[in-house]
């Protein structure tokens, strides 16, 4: 699986074994949905008071 791991959409990395999801975190209260954090995960992180996480399982989907 290949996931973006920076705010720039053309930079990505291959996820290590066992990390089979890509995630993207955005600020909940900010009108523009600019990714704050992206990367690989073994399960989808939980939303927090400030961040909303979206997960997916195909190459470069985040």
Curated annotation (Swiss-Prot):
User: Does the record's keyword annotation contain Mitochondrion?
Assistant: no
Q: Does the keyword Ribonucleoprotein apply?
A: no
The record's keywords, sorted A to Z, are: Disulfide bond, Membrane, Secreted, Target cell membrane, Target membrane, Toxin
Q: Write down the Pfam families for this protein, in alphabetical order.
A: Toxin_cobra-type (PF21947)
State the tissue distribution.
Answer: Expressed by the venom gland.
- Between which residues do disulfide bridges form? 3-22, 15-40, 44-55, 56-61
Gene Ontology cellular-component terms for this entry are: extracellular region; membrane; other organism cell membrane
Highest taxon of the lineage: Eukaryota
Recorded GO molecular functions are:
toxin activity
- Biological function: Has low cytotoxic activity.
Q: Any additional notes? A: Is classified as a P-type cytotoxin, since a proline residue stands at position 31 (Pro-31 in standard classification).
Annotated family? Belongs to the three-finger toxin family. Short-chain subfamily. Orphan group XV sub-subfamily.
Q: What is this protein called?
A: Cytotoxin homolog
Species this chain originates from: Naja kaouthia
